Amino acid sequence: MRQPLICSGHSRPVSDLSFSNENSDGSFIVSACLDGSPMLRNGENGDWIGTFEGHKGAVWSSRFNSTASQALTASADYTVKLWDTLNGSEILSIEHQSIVKTADFSNNNSRVVTGGSEKILRIFDLERPNDPLLQISGHTNTIKTATWSVHNDDIVLSGGLDEVIRIWDLRSGTQVSLCAKSSITSMEFSKDRRFLVTTAGNEVTFWDAQSFYPLKVYSLPFDVNCASLHPDNSKFIAGGSDFWVHVYDFSTGNEIEVNKGHHGPVNCCRFSPDGASFASGSLDGTIRLWKGM
């Protein structure tokens, strides 16, 4: 069993984390936490770099833009905040009418999508953020996760407590619904842009990233909160209700290893961009960085 680097600093459950793309300075981790203080860390060793100060409520999601120059956080204080990762300053704050659970950058970094307990998706232009470009209704319960298609900045995907993944065409306003058996807990695209990885209930599903046809569905013996596919597509990690981070063979679904250490359910997990490590965040308030993949 591998021994993780334990990244302390948060005082309440860690709700989300993301790795940046690699650049000349390496990679970084941004974490969201119910303590309201998102943190920036070195992606190689987990060392704390800084804390983004300004939220007045729990922070539910955290994302980098493609160059790692900015970070985006969504909060229970009814705001989405854009941060400068170099100096930690708040660039702008986008007001909402209720708790915001998710926010993500478009591929070209010019727009963001947000969603939360209002059950409404909003699209904002970061050059003119005072009013949304679009407001999209259709979800019947809280939106927990939303992201942009890696192949088309006019396509947005969202999922949440209504047990449906919705694929929205922003040009026409039409949607396609992919039904799940349980609430959608996480959603990410693979590094090579071939797969969409989603979790719901005890299932991890791998979809074709262009046709959105389900290619593989693996049922696991615990409720899954998160999953991430290795950059070479050989294996995936999953975490959830049993406190452990599991590693599975992508082709067969067979379990390769179990990583124990968290003292609460695993809320989020991601592979590093080079695949040499993965990070997990938990209800126990810690981030653990697992090396040597």
From Swiss-Prot:
One Pfam family here: eIF2A
Gene Ontology BP annotations: negative regulation of transforming growth factor beta receptor signaling pathway; spliceosomal snRNP assembly
One Gene Ontology cellular component annotation held by this UniProt entry: SMN complex
CDD domains, per database record: WD40
UniProt entry keywords in alphabetical sequence: mRNA processing, mRNA splicing, Repeat, WD repeat
One Gene Ontology term of the molecular function aspect: RNA binding
Residue stretches of each WD repeat: 9-53, 54-93, 95-134, 138-178, 180-217, 219-258, 261-293
Disulfide bond residue pairs: none
Listed InterPro entries: G-protein_beta_WD-40_rep (IPR020472), TIF_beta_prop-like (IPR013979), WD40/YVTN_repeat-like_dom_sf (IPR015943), WD40_repeat_CS (IPR019775), WD40_repeat_dom_sf (IPR036322), WD40_rpt (IPR001680)
The family this protein is said to belong to: Belongs to the WD repeat STRAP family.
Annotated function: The SMN complex catalyzes the assembly of small nuclear ribonucleoproteins (snRNPs), the building blocks of the spliceosome, and thereby plays an important role in the splicing of cellular pre-mRNAs. Most spliceosomal snRNPs contain a common set of Sm proteins SNRPB, SNRPD1, SNRPD2, SNRPD3, SNRPE, SNRPF and SNRPG that assemble in a heptameric protein ring on the Sm site of the small nuclear RNA to form the core snRNP (Sm core).
Subunit details: Part of the core SMN complex.
Protein known as: Serine-threonine kinase receptor-associated protein
Taxonomic path: Eukaryota, Amoebozoa, Evosea, Eumycetozoa, Dictyostelia
Gene for this chain: strap
